Amino acid sequence: GGISIIDAKPFITDIEKLPADITENNQVNGKVLIYHTHTNEAYLKTEQERIQQLYASRTNDSEYTVVKTGNTLTDALEKYGISVDHDTSNNEENGYNRAYATSMSNITSMTKENGKYSLYIDLHRDSYTKNVDSTVTIDGVKVAKVMFVVGTQAPDYKNNLALAEKMMELLNEIHPQLCERVLEVDTNYNQNISDHALLIEVGDNAVTAEEASRAAEYVAQALAELHGVMW
């Protein structure tokens, strides 16, 4: 996360090339892999914190990080009959600036062990942008906004881009501002792992963990609609 223009993070130099032997087990396993390169990205605990402009940063308490959102997304996808592996490894354990290298190592190991996943999701949260609403209201409750980031250096990035754009379309049928945008960036974000790879920013550090979880339910709904069609 944290890849908004105003709050760029030093992510480009640490991204690893895809190991040559990853195709040792090239059978597609039909599962989704959800993981978190920036595992400790945190959300607010309460709406009162937002009112007080106490924006979240990082925490090891997974009840208030992107891991919690990943748990919600996992549960929601499984209700649609989609099998999921949710990797909650702390990819920041070797240092924040090595997070992409660490996550690539982890997802490569899981791919070698389990076969190629049908879809890889790196789930983040963004950084708050001043004077921009972080939530939308659906059925009377606040839901975190969503965005997608596509690395244009990934060999088959156009497939990832098409998937992200279709996801945006479906989410914005639910609410016209639920998905803010699809951002293309000149790097790969480890999306060279597959031509079915998404980096999803669910909310930012001005939303609560609960609001992010609500968004994850809608992300699952859109993913389920595209299951067997685009991935």
Label each PLM-derived region with a short phrase.
Residues 1-37, 42-46:
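Non-catalytic propeptide/linker segments at domain boundaries
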Residues 31-36, 83-85, 119-124, 145-149, ...:
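Soluble periplasmic/extracytoplasmic beta-strand elements of cell-envelope proteins
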Residues 39-42, 90-94, 125-130, 153-156, ...:
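Solvent-exposed loop/turn segments at secondary-structure junctions
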Residues 53-56, 129-155, 164:
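A short, glycine/acidic-enriched catalytic loop
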Residues 55-66, 89-100, 150-158, 201-210:
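Second-shell loop/turn segments in exported
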Residues 58-133:
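Catalytic-core regions of hydrolytic enzymes
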Residues 156-183:
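Active-site-adjacent substrate-binding region
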Residues 181-231:
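Active-site-adjacent mobile loop/cap segments within catalytic or ligand-binding domains
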